[in-house]
Amino acid sequence: MKIYYEDSLPYAAEFFAGLGDSQVFSHKDVNGELVADADVLLVRSTTKVNAELLKANQNIKYVGTATAGTNHLDKEYLRSRGLDIHSAAGCNAVAVAEYVLSALFVMAEKLDWQLTTKTVGIVGAGHVGTRLTEKLTALGIRYHLCDPPLADAGDTRDFVDMDTIMQCDIISLHVPLIEGGQYNTGHMFDAKRIGQLRKDQLLINACRGEVIDNKALLKSFESGYKLNVVLDVWENEPDIDQALVPYIALATAHIAGHTVEGKARGTEMLYQQVCEQFGFNATKKLSDYLPAPQPSIITLDETLSGQAQLSALVLSVYDIRKDSKQFKETIEQPDQFRYIRKNYSIRREFAALSVNTGNYSGSEAIYALGFNRK
């Protein structure tokens, strides 16, 4: 069996060794001729899988993406070939939720907010939105959920409408890109909805760039409209509108889900799917390959308490300001968006770390965030 995998899949060589003849490729070089004899094709969002790529391949039996999103897969074409759509839905949900927490604590400091007095409106209650609700609950932060497709499908959680979301202090977007139809999310935040935002609100987009009309957002800023916006995703990536960048409070290069665990978990999920489809025993686990974080134990600063303590802890693991600073200072360089994503620094999830809480009274909140006890 011929297995071709993109070079950006962490630990793919280790996971797929022994399942067949494994070949690695770069998204920059991949073409139909290169993968013409592939039985299994494993990609990330940088490789578009369509008729052009697979027209010369008569062997393909499995196509999988080690990402939660599938917009780079031509689903109609793959189904016409009798191929299911395989993805790693939820693989980076924890990572994105922790990215949002970092943004919240940074913006709370900037805006002099006590987060427990604020309400977060979460649009999209799938994998990421659900993980975010768990983190917010641990911190005692109120939230509302809006997800019409899930509500209509019978999900029994307490959902609100977008009018209610627009009244929240913080709005965090976690929807898939759906263009057209009843549940359209393309330009969900168009000029009209952007115009409804208040200067004392915070808007976070860590899902798909096209969910916010970037041209309308830029026009609002240029007209003097004051908004607090955090963007990890942009329209027309990687060729984004650089004129928008200086106006964004925290700006990053679509890396919210790029923890070591988040990316590698996608590879593990594809490994499990391939084993199931082809009758192999899935004996390998992500924990077999993940390195121990350095340091692996965090000791709380006993001079801090409350939000300051939690903020210091979260930002010691991941401080979004560093990524935003690099992004803003270098994005004008050629192909920098891709470069940042490709060469992203090591970032670990809370669950990889243990915390020595000492006599801190809020230790249960820390463990509920996902940290381990020391």
UniProtKB/Swiss-Prot annotation:
Keywords: Cytoplasm, NAD, Oxidoreductase, Pyridoxine biosynthesis
Residues that bind substrate: 45, 67
Residue positions binding NAD(+): 147, 232, 257
Record GO terms (molecular function): 4-phosphoerythronate dehydrogenase activity; NAD binding; protein dimerization activity
Compartment annotation: Cytoplasm
Catalysed reaction, written as an equation: 4-phospho-D-erythronate + NAD(+) = (R)-3-hydroxy-2-oxo-4-phosphooxybutanoate + NADH + H(+)
The name this protein goes by in its record: Erythronate-4-phosphate dehydrogenase
InterPro entries: D-isomer_2_OHA_DH_cat_dom, D-isomer_DH_CS, D-isomer_DH_NAD-bd, Erythronate-4-P_DHase, Erythronate-4-P_DHase_dimer, NAD(P)-bd_dom_sf, PdxB_dimer_sf
Species whose genome carries this gene: Pseudoalteromonas atlantica (strain T6c / ATCC BAA-1087)
A GO BP annotation: pyridoxine biosynthetic process
HAMAP family attached to this UniProt entry: PdxB (MF_01825)
Homology family: Belongs to the D-isomer specific 2-hydroxyacid dehydrogenase family. PdxB subfamily.
Disulfide pairings: none
Active-site feature positions: 208, 237, 254 (proton donor)
This protein's GO CC annotations: cytosol
UniProt enzyme class: oxidoreductase
